[in-house]
């Protein structure tokens, strides 16, 4: 939320010298413990602890900065990156292997062989699909995957399936993997099939000794349980049981491919799992242990080589796109501003972790640019900007014309023009895909985004603490999920007619749930830092206001329960078979939620990018896979 004061238009420690006014700037590096009246008619509650570095200029007015760490990925480093995997020979080798694997899969579909029989054909087919998807190469095998899943579904019944079409009894591993895979592809399958695997006490049964096969079955049960819909108690029971079981297994089994997979799945689950990160991890475990291989050794070897080649071929494209993005940032006003978070590389990494299609460069770069713009505006409205400046910027944005900059302070002029040019450029790109004007969609989203920030600024200026419901309604917009989603998905090259777009964009249930989840989860990790900067309102503080006597721990527990409930509702909105929008049309919107949610797994990954997110950049963008 924005700080309310009048400050000169620039500060030496926050803005490049070309933006500094002619008046002398006197830096003061100390902590301001309290702050009373800032300007006539505007106050900030003196009891709020102000724990930031303030800059005092010659008129004694202060401007806040949040002391975020600087850009971790310098342009000189990005421009120095190189890779040989863009050469034609690698592409040709990958294409050849893909063709050979398709032939093997199609031959399996026609008739049983020596290794695939009527007693194991269902689990073998499901395992092939699962391996292909987890290796990140499924875009090459869409038809083959559909053929396999149609075959498996033809044998699905109210008790699930056995290992093969002629199996006498159903099997937990086959049923759990089938439930997960079929549900993710839109087949109407009920979780009731899991009830039969409980004992007379209503508990999932397991043997006294954990065998490798049983551990693998429980792992697939855990993976299936994460794709739960509202009201599916058996899925909740399955998640609780399998989580405990797998954590115990990690304590007893030696370090191996299976233990690494268990650790990864427990860590990332589904909602914080990113496809490219999963592929990088699965490449390391696939093929190194018989439990992961396909019945055809040649297929296993070919799939592994395809996965490595695809990872590195896309790596070469990532470098080209990242160099473009880094130049865009360096040549813009952003590189001259030191007060905001510079996270363009991190945002690009998230986009490239959820979409590796070579044709979708506009999506990846657009997501990175739009998200970076949103973050810069977040820091302007939250800390650096004064109320007068914010009102001017809000009015200028709604006018949407370059001439509107003449009323803005210098540092805002550059930001405004970058926003104006980037949004218009993306709209022109989206117009080609959609066959209609899309700029109005974008402008409406940005206006709502900025209005939500102005509301928060007014709350802090008056010392007003809203109700939990009022705060959340506004916070769902100010998180910025809509601006980060709308324009990028419209550039994908896939038409989004109105009846499809209304299932994805505001005010659809999918959009509402995604925004709620991200705002709630985000506040859990940011409220303490924001409170130290004088930003009073958060889901936690508003809940405590509505529930006198409650503690921060009570609030966090309540909010986590809300998030878990909303995630199940989101699963349903994404995967429901009766939706007007196919899963493929909703996938990017859903995956963008997963990308943002990934950053809040352990901390505020937007503000503190030195830890997990830095490793994500290195693992999925900077470093290739050894062939």
Curated annotation (Swiss-Prot):
Q: Which GO terms describe its molecular function?
A: lyase activity; magnesium ion binding; R-linalool synthase activity; terpene synthase activity
One Pfam family recorded for the sequence: Terpene_synth_C
Its pathway, per UniProt, is:
Terpene metabolism; oleoresin biosynthesis
So which cofactors does this thing need? Answer: Mg(2+); Mn(2+)
Q: Where is the transit peptide?
A: 1-21
Which residues are recorded as binding Mg(2+) 2?
378, 382
Q: Which gene encodes it?
A: TPS-Lin-1
**What species is this protein from?**
Picea sitchensis
* Top enzyme class: lyase
Q: What is its EC number?
A: 4.2.3.26
- Supply the name of the protein: (R)-linalool synthase 1, chloroplastic
Renumbered ranges of motif DDXXD motif: 378-382
Q: What is its main location?
A: plastid
Organism's domain of life?
Eukaryota
* Family according to the record: Belongs to the terpene synthase family. Tpsd subfamily.
Q: Where can this protein be found?
A: Plastid, Chloroplast
Task: Tell me the InterPro entries matching this sequence.
Answer: Isoprenoid_synthase_dom_sf (IPR008949), Terpene_cyclase-like_1_C (IPR034741), Terpene_cyclase_plant_C1 (IPR044814), Terpene_synth_N (IPR001906), Terpene_synth_N_sf (IPR036965), Terpene_synthase-like (IPR050148), Terpene_synthase_metal-bd (IPR005630), Terpenoid_cyclase/PrenylTrfase (IPR008930)
């Amino acid at each position: 939320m924005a700080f309310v004061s009048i400050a000169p238009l620039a500060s030496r420690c926050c803005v490049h010298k070309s933006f500094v006014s002619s008046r002398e700037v006197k830096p003061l590096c100390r902590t301001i413990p309290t702050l009373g009246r800032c300007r006539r008619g505007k106050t900030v509650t003196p009891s709020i602890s102000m724990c930031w570095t303030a800059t005092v200029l010659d008129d004694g007015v202060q401007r806040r900065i949040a002391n975020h760490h600087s850009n971790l990925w310098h342009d000189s480093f990005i421009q120095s990156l190189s890779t040989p995997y863009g050469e034609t020979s690698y592409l040709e080798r990958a294409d050849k292997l893909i063709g050979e694997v398709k032939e093997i899969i199609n031959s399996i579909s026609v008739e049983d062989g020596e290794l695939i029989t009527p007693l194991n054909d269902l689990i073998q087919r499901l395992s092939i699909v699962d391996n292909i998807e987890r290796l990140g190469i499924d875009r090459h095998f869409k038809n083959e995957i559909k053929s396999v899943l149609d075959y498996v579904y033809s044998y699905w019944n109210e008790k699930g399936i056995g290992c093969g079409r002629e199996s006498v009894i159903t099997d937990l591993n086959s049923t759990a993997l089938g439930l997960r895979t079929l549900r993710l592809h839109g087949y109407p399958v009920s979780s009731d099939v899991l009830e039969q695997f409980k004992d007379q006490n209503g508990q999932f049964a397991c043997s006294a000794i954990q065998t490798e096969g049983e551990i693998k079955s429980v792992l697939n049960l855990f993976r299936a349980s994460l794709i739960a819909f509202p009201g599916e108690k058996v899925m909740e029971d399955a998640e609780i049981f399998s989580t405990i079981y797998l954590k115990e297994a990690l304590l007893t089994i030696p370090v191996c491919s299976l233990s690494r997979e268990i650790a990864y799945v427990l860590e990332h689950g589904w909602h914080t799992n990113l496809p490219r990160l999963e592929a990088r991890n699965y490449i390391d475990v696939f093929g190194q242990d018989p439990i992961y291989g396909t019945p055809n050794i040649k297929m296993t070897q070919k799939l592994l080589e395809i996965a490595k080649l695809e990872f590195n071929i896309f790596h070469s494209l990532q470098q080209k796109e990242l160099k473009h993005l880094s130049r865009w940032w360096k040549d813009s006003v952003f590189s001259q501003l030191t007060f905001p978070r510079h996270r363009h590389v991190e945002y690009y990494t998230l986009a490239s972790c959820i979409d590796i299609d070579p044709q979708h460069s506009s999506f990846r770069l657009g997501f990175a640019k739009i998200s970076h713009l949103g973050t810069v505006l977040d820091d302007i409205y939250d800390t650096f900007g004064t109320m007068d400046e914010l009102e001017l910027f809000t009015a200028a944005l709604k006018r949407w014309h370059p001439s509107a900059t003449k009323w803005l302070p210098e540092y805002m002029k550059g930001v405004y023009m970058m926003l104006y040019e980037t949004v218009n450029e993306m709209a022109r790109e989206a117009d080609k895909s959609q066959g209609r004007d899309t700029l109005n969609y974008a402008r409406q989203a940005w206006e709502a985004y900025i209005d939500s920030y102005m509301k928060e600024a007014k709350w802090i200026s008056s010392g007003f603490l809203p109700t939990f419901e009022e705060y959340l309604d506004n916070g769902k917009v100010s998180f910025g999920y809509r601006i980060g989603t709308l324009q990028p998905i419209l550039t994908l090259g896939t038409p989004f007619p109105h009846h499809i777009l209304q299932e994805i964009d505001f005010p659809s249930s999918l959009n509402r749930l995604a925004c709620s989840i991200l705002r709630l989860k985000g506040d859990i990790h940011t409220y303490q830092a924001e409170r130290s900067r004088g930003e009073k309102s958060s889901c936690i503080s508003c809940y405590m206001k509505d529930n006198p006597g409650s503690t921060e721990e009570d609030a966090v527990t309540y909010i986590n329960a809300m998030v878990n409930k909303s995630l199940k509702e989101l699963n349903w909105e994404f995967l429901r078979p009766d939706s007007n929008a196919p899963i493929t049309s909703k996938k990017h919107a859903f995956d963008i939620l997963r990308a943002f949610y990934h950053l809040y797994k352990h901390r505020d990954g937007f503000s503190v990018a030195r830890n997990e997110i830095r490793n994500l950049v290195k693992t999925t963008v900077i470093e290739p896979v050894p062939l």
